[in-house]
Amino acid sequence: MANIKSAIKRIQIAERNRLRNKSYKSAVKTLMKKYYAAVEDYKANPSEEAKKAVDQAMSAAYSKIDKAVKCRILHRNNGARKKSQLANALKQVTTAS
């Protein structure tokens, strides 16, 4: 444990940032799972409502990923890869049907 006042403060700041980053990453993962679930629903029952749900889920996931990249919680290549995976999931469903 640190004895110097500035070192103690840095430890507190690092912990605060770790928790903030963890919540952002968790939110990104949750939105990605919701998107994949919406894509599966669309695959099982391709309808206009399902397509709208997929588009809304994609928009929410893209937005959260972009915000995480902007705050430097995710590296920009990691964010781009996640967005690419989301797009490919929908592309495979739409080209198959």
Curated annotation (Swiss-Prot):
GO terms for cellular component: cytosol; small ribosomal subunit. GO terms for molecular function: small ribosomal subunit rRNA binding; structural constituent of ribosome. Keywords: Ribonucleoprotein, Ribosomal protein, RNA-binding, rRNA-binding. One of its GO terms (biological process) is translation. It comes from the Bacteria. Binds directly to 16S ribosomal RNA. NCBIfam families: S20 (TIGR00029). Belongs to the bacterial ribosomal protein bS20 family. This is Small ribosomal subunit protein bS20. It comes from Gloeothece citriformis (strain PCC 7424) (Cyanothece sp. (strain PCC 7424)). The lineage of its organism: Bacteria, Bacillati, Cyanobacteriota, Cyanophyceae, Oscillatoriophycideae.
